[in-house]
Amino acid sequence: MKDHRLWLKRRELLIYIAIFLYSVALFLKRVNLPINQNLLNKTMMLGTLIALANIIFDRKMNPKQWILTAVIGLLLLVDSLPTGNHELFYLFIIIWSCRNLEKRALMKYIFGIVLIMTLLTGYLTCLGIVKNDVFILNETRVRYGLGYNVWSILPFQFLALCFMYLYLTQKRVYIWKIGAMIVMAFAIGEVTDTSSSSMLTALGLLCLYATQFVHIKKWNKLKWLMWVPEILAGFSIMATFLYMRGNSFFVRLNAVLHYRFLYQALGFNDFGIGLFANPEYETSTDPETYFGIDNNYINLLIAWGIVALIVILFVYSYLIKYCIRMENIKLLIIIMIFVFTAIMWSRLLVLIEAEYLVCFSEAFKDKRLRDKKEYLFQ
């Protein structure tokens, strides 16, 4: 057992390097810096190749784990072939490579990378080195990017940092810290014109704060939550088609939600639904030609295809089941917030925001290193 752990320790450094390369490149792809996108893509690929070596040389999995690895890996690889965009495949490899590492330490590591990069981006934006784009929509809505190429990035990134801080901290969190985070969230929301993200941040922070005083005794009764991602995906599709048929409720709701249903309907009409990724799908942040599908479930279905949507729904059902099995209320709340808000924002697959994705690697963890309670495939 000690020899096995020593062998793993020698490989852990490579995994941390892989995560660093992947996370930094992914972060920089969203920042207004004159960096060659092809270089960033190759950096992500390099990180993935380092992580891939852990799969090639790893033999300590049971047949079910090998089958699951092969099925998900091949499905995501084949799914990406029509577009040549292998980001989902890269993400899976990075997550898989974390299977025998301590998950809280990994999340803390990614949190540290993102926090430093966020502070550095803010500082460089104040100095004028990073461009602060101004977006004007419908001639009335003025939004600032604050150093990022899309105005919605920083608000949700700040939300994710706050949530992960409350999850990772071992000390009691005082209400004044929650209040300070909420004030900062509304300040960012005011500048970026994303009030909904500010309210979501406030609600999530208060829920996480309340976990210090709330204890769940009957966790088994929460198992139904693992089907919530599938329910929300089905509801999103149904709601869009009802809007396309002229349902008065969803037509009015479309105006309230800043035409989200309109863009989803355009996506279905212009690109349709395929089994695999659609090479013709393209978004635009240009105010004159703006097009984007914010609903993560619809976005996955149209841009990445039916196969990718099914795989991601399975991943999130597993993550919810994992939280319930481990009786981890904080992580469960964070994941459920991401799952519910996926009907409005596409953030389910952004590792530098959804650090909890590394927990999916528990499905492939070496049985000798497992706690019996953790072993979901026994």
Give the location of each predicted region:
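Long extracytoplasmic/lumenal interhelical loops at the membrane interface
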Residues: F249-W304
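Interfacial loop-to-helix junctions that mark the boundaries of transmembrane helices
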Residues: I35-L39
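Membrane-proximal cytoplasmic C-terminal regulatory module of class A 7TM GPCRs
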Residues: K372-Q378
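Hydrophobic transmembrane helix bundles of membrane-integrated enzymes that assemble
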Residues: K2-K29, L40-R59, K64-S248, N295-K372
